[in-house]
Amino acid sequence: MPGSAKGSIVDGPDGQPVGSRHIAQAFANEKYFQPRPSAVDYNAAGSGGSNLGASNPKLRERVVETLKGRTEASVPADAVTTSGSGLDPHITRANADGQRDRVEAAWAKQLDPAKVKTEVTAALDAATFRPLGGLVGGDPLVNVLELNLDLTKRLAGR
C-alpha cells in the first residue's frame, strides 16, 4: 500500500495536504458530497461508534435531523447511521446518488447545468469501486475525499 506508512495523505489542487484517504472528514460546502454521520465529529484522535440503541429516542432524533434535505424515497442506511469507527471514509454509491441533486444544483449556480451533470457523473463513475474487486459482493463504494477532490479539479479547476 504505497503511502500508507505516511498516513495515506491526499494533496489538494495546490499541492498541500487536505486529508487522509482512510479517515472521513466533514465537508461544509453544499458543492461537496458528505460522508456518513460521525459519532465522534470526525475526530481521528477519538474514534468510536455511537452506543445509541434502536430504542433510544436520541438516535431517532439524530436520524430525523440527518434525513432533512434528502429527497429520495429510500434513503441508504449509511446516510443516517455512523460506522463503527465514526471515521469511515467511504459511502455507498446509493448514498452518493442520493446527494447528487444537491451537489449538482450547488455547482450549477456558477456553471452550465449540463456540464455539471456530465462532470458529476464522470467523477462518480471514476470514484466507484467494489470492495476486494467485487469478489465478495457488497455495495459499490465511493471514497468521499477523493470524489470531492476530483469534482474540484473537474469543475473549479477550469
Regions found by a protein language model. Name each.
Residues 80-158:
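Soluble extracytoplasmic domains of inner/organellar membrane proteins
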Residues 1-99, 103-106, 130-131, 135:
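Flexible, solvent-exposed loop/hinge segments and secondary-structure transition points
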